[in-house]
A protein has these predicted regions:
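Basic, glycine/lysine-rich polyanion-binding surfaces/domains
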Residues: 1-175
Length: 175
């Protein structure tokens, strides 16, 4: 089972661990009800390093995203994020994803942990149409990126204290 860079911290701090999508993940520390209430009232930090990250790069990156995605990634600007799904072409959905536009030729897709391989294969197959090659314009960085999510009504205040040089108040939704 895979671990995240934060696993030693979780264990040191008494997390109850369980398997999810091939990862040993923290399920709770002090109790699910207490933690739920804390996040709803204040904030909480979640290890979401099990999520998948796939880079799509090059002059045909947007063409691929418009072909495989349910939303129009052409409406994104640098730093903007879009929620979308990957339709399977048969009336169903491969997965729901987040599309981050880094610049006009660089996008980062965040995909669900349980679907990384399925999403990767779907993107590689579709990428052939646009000359996008695995390991080059398409790159699965899922085992190289760790993520923490700060959620709750005080999340922005907490992150602002960690990043005092950034004016997070200027960020629009999904940026």
């Amino acid at each position: 089972m895979k671990t995240t860079p934060f696993t030693p911290y979780h264990i040191r701090n008494g997390a109850r661990m369980a398997g999810f999508a091939g990862y040993d993940m923290p399920i709770e520390f002090t109790g699910i009800n207490d933690e739920h209430t804390a996040v709803r009232a204040r904030a909480g930090v979640f290890d979401v390093s099990h999520m998948g990250e796939i880079w799509v790069k090059g002059p045909r990156a947007l063409d691929l995203l418009r072909y495989v995605g349910s939303n129009d990634a052409a409406s994104l600007y640098d730093g903007k994020i879009q929620y979308a799904c990957l339709p399977n072409g048969r009336g169903g959905i491969v997965d729901d994803i987040l599309v981050y536009r880094i610049d006009a030729e660089t996008y980062l897709l965040v995909v669900n942990a349980a679907n990384v391989e399925k999403d990767w294969n779907h993107l590689v197959a579709a990428g052939e149409r646009f000359g996008l090659r695995p390991g080059r314009e398409l790159y699965n960085a899922s085992d190289e990126i760790a993520q923490l999510a700060v959620q709750g009504p005080l999340a922005m205040r907490i992150v602002q204290r960690l990043c005092p040089a950034a004016d997070l108040g200027k960020l629009a939704y999904y940026t």
